[in-house]
């Protein structure tokens, strides 16, 4: 996802082969890919299930992590993962992200506060965090997944000013109007912290419900 087109071209001019692994769309750069970054990595380096097994990894878990990177929890079942396999992948995902309960007490408390004050407007969750040091989006996503059979749309405000709209078919429309970036198979949109004045839920809902 880095270092960016200018430096990438400089590297090419210097004789380096540059291979980009990314799956996002940014303001002035479209790097969408149906495969997640992990899945692309496995393909580019021709890493097989046997290779993963020899390296001490569970291939099924690794493939599941790749699916979660592009489709989160909701992508596992369509990709053929059983309920028990999905549970294993989720635990491993959170372990590697340092999200398991007790490993980051400050984050857990922030998520709890945000979750308790959640509200819904026009069928869309609105969730706000007061933590300027840690982002809560992924943990909130796990809570939404535990309480819903299908992914509900949500607007998540981070304490540092970042805003994310996820599980929303209008993510490309939000991108067209407000810039930022898309991810999650074009079902999620976000804008970096403090890059622009904070968008209100009302401003976002106009497009989400368009």
For each predicted feature, which ranges?
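Active-site rim beta-loop-alpha module in soluble metabolic enzymes
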Residues: 76-141
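Exposed alpha-helical structural elements
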Residues: 60-64, 88, 106, 139, ...
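Charged/polar, solvent-exposed surface patches and flexible loops
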Residues: 9, 13, 43, 63-67, ...
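Short acidic, S/G/P-rich loop/turn micro-motifs used as interaction or catalytic elements
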Residues: 3-6, 25-27, 72-74, 131-136
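Short alpha-helices
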Residues: 23-94
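Glycine/small-residue-rich interface belts in oligomeric ring/scaffold proteins
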Residues: 1-35
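Gly/His-enriched, cation/cofactor- and phosphate-binding structural elements
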Residues: 11-19, 46-53, 112-210
